[in-house]
Amino acid sequence: MSSQDPPPATSTQKKQSESLVNLLAEASRFYRKAYNELFSGLITEWEPESSTNIPDYMLFGWHLFLNLRLRSPELFKDLVSCIHGLVAVLAILLVHVPAKFRTFTIEGSSHLIKQTEKGVDLIASLCHNYHTSEECLKEMMDKSHKAIEEVFSMKALSASECKTENLDKIDTDRLMYFKGLIDMECFQSNLEKIEKLCNSNNCEAELDFKLILTNNDYIPCAENLSRDSTNLGCSKCAFETLASPRKTIKNMLTVPSSPLSPTNGCSVKIVQMTPITSAMTTAKWLREVISSLPEKPSSKLQQLMSSCDRDLTYAVTERVSIVLEAIFPTKSSADRGGSLGLNCANAFDTLWADARKMEASKLYYRVLEAICRAELQNSNVNNLTPLLSNERFHRCLIACSADVVLATHKTVIMMFPAVLESAGLTSFDLSKIIENFVRHEETLPRELKRHLNSLEEQILESMAWEKGSSLYNSLIVARPSVASEINRFGLLAESMPSLDDLVARQNIHIEGLPATPSKKRAAGRDDNADPRSPKRPCNESRSPVVEHNLQTPPPKQCHMVLTSLKAKCHPLQSTFASPTVSNPVGGNEKCADVTIQIFFSKILKLAAIRIRNLCERIQYMEQTERVYNVFKQILDQQTTLFFNRHIDQLILCCLYGVAKVCQLELSFREILNNYKKEAQCKPEVFLSIYIGSRNHNGVLISRHVDIITFYNEVFVPAAKPFLVSLISSGTRPEDKKNASGQVPGSPKLSPFPNLPDMSPKKVSASHNVYVSPLRQTKMDLLLSPSSRSFYACIGEGTHAYQSPSKDLAAINSRLNYNGRRVNSRLNFDMVSDSVVAGSLGQPNGGSTSLDPAAAFSPLSKRKPDT
């Protein structure tokens, strides 16, 4: 690479660029739909017939929005700001576009229903239609007016001073008018000028923003908007391929209709909850419920903090300022010696970042007070000092509040888990606060509950098992038998950075706080951390909330069941205690023991649901419990199989292993073909599985293999005892009838020699190479009777048969595959409220079923939520 070549884009930069494309595509879809509701699709008199059939007025408004976006950086950071900008553009078009191009008349219009004494209130009507904030919309219109003045050298006039047909019966008090902006004589030149300006100032030169508007392939279809789109992720590098993001902009929620409206008695149409409506609905909640709260802790919360062993009010408020400044830095990278650009996560616009910090802090104080009130009602809590002085607890709650705010605005430049990295946390840390957050914020919209549920699933299935997760710091205490493996692969998390470290990292100075490091600020370990704690003092234990939505822990030992039953009494403060600290209500057990039991219970619940769904899809429901039991035993006794891996990889292997020992007609290919239909499927789960080992020099090396190789080399040796137990327990009828002393599961001995297979074919004239099909008789000879039932043979493919030419091409493509990364992402299907409640906690505090096996019950049709 030459010195002038730009550095290769990181995965984070690519992810942000992909998300930007999806955001703009969704914004353009909203704009086209709104424009077509307000204006006719007729082309102007001077507009030539084009292949795109995009009216020039629509194109002019789109370029005006793009120019506004370039001038105001906050417009490209989240979907809510984009919608406010586009609604401002629509207001300007309504003022300037000739009235004959409207689809409505002012009298009795359903589009403009807000009235004043002077006529229709245009801004209030648009805010009502599109759930926007009048204050934000006014700010956007002011920015748009300034942009028009600078671009076209025009002076804004008060609309009340202008006499034009467009403004008839409209209240013009708060509106501005530009003479000549869309007049016939100069409109074409104005359109060309602003389009040229947008192209020349486009810092994302790879993207054709006009194509995003004009190409229908860029516009996500409403029918496809059925899955989660909190992060607006894309399954492939859209900013490079310019592919349609239709299948990747997903929303997991559809608002069902009620049979009859109680007000008018008419049937109500089903409302499709798109990313736009979802974002505007949650933004309305944030604006009306959270933003109206006081900036500082309430008097009740201040009383609770001051009543501790020492007054913690200053420490709490100082921490909020520092952590939120680290998450939403207002200093650009240029100020720190870096460079600005689209993908710079530290280039937050000051006004935008300050608004997000204010929202997150208010939400944090609100939930913190609710948690404190609930803890005081716990019979085991008579002092809030341990909880309110716990650094990790506060950071997790702050990070969760910030993530909810970002999810509300559909932000693309700061995505999960970037919030955790900025706060010095790991995903396992966040998993301990999610349920408490949802339980104690009763007004949280359903969309945000589903967002947090999807985060919890991501953490459980893979993120918590990644290298550097604080899970291993608890696991090494709770399961000493895996300590050597954890240390061998260097899986332990680093110490949590202190607040001073965050200040130094961001080079920030909080107004009103001392510029010098404060001795009160937390260091890497918490104030109540045990000095014998491992490398990273991960302070977690059982939460009283978790009990209500978890299945009973696996009954591998009696004391685990007893512990789980009495865990309802565990105070939240023990959840964040150091792993080596004794559980205050658990006798001789450590906090790490209870923490791992809780986490494993969540894993088992998620696995039970996925095993049931997969077995039902394959139509082997009778094997569901066996697969689950094998998975449960592996999680308990072969926990190292999960290190650096995805739980679906173990589920697939368990299913195939059970099928082998039970002699079912089920191949890996069939399992994978059905797994690909699952909502959470992504190709790298079965194409790239981590295997770590040391070479002859003792150097740790890692390689990634497909699932069949992993199954044969790693899974079978570790899981064989559990699979053998299925045979010994009589899983097959013929096993019970076997009286010959033969190894169960082995083929019957035959008195005749095996018949030869077909004559092999010579495949090369110059080489003595012959190829013949792999027959069952050959397979029987290659594998011993005791092991034949466990292994997968090479003849079993992971892809469905197509044709010889296509299969050979696919083989060559895989042989030439140089990278591990598979362009895909997790998409979470819509889940029922019962599943969400089971994972996040019942709103009324009730408990759910305590048996994970309950997930095996046959699926029944779920009625839509009303």
Swiss-Prot record:
Residues 274-475 are annotated as: Domain A. Residues 274-721 are annotated as: Pocket. InterPro entries: Cyclin-like_sf (IPR036915), RB_A (IPR002720), RB_B (IPR002719), RB_fam (IPR028309), RB_N (IPR024599). The keyword Transcription regulation applies. Residues 523-539 have a biased composition (Basic and acidic residues). Ubiquitous. GO terms for cellular component: chromatin; nucleus; transcription regulator complex. The keyword Nucleus applies. GO terms for biological process: cell differentiation; negative regulation of G1/S transition of mitotic cell cycle; regulation of transcription by RNA polymerase II. Residues 841-850 have a biased composition (Polar residues). GO terms for molecular function: RNA polymerase II transcription regulatory region sequence-specific DNA binding. SMART domains: RB_A (SM01368). Its main location: nucleus. Residues 476-593 are annotated as: Spacer. Residues 594-721 are annotated as: Domain B. It is found in: Nucleus. Keywords: Cell cycle, Nucleus, Repressor, Transcription, Transcription regulation. Residues 513-551, 731-754, 839-866 are annotated as: Disordered. Regulator of biological processes that recruits a histone deacetylase to control gene transcription. May play a role in the entry into mitosis, negatively regulating the cell proliferation. Formation of stable complexes with geminiviridae replication-associated proteins may create a cellular environment which favors viral DNA replication. Belongs to the retinoblastoma protein (RB) family. This is Retinoblastoma-related protein 2. It comes from Zea mays (Maize).
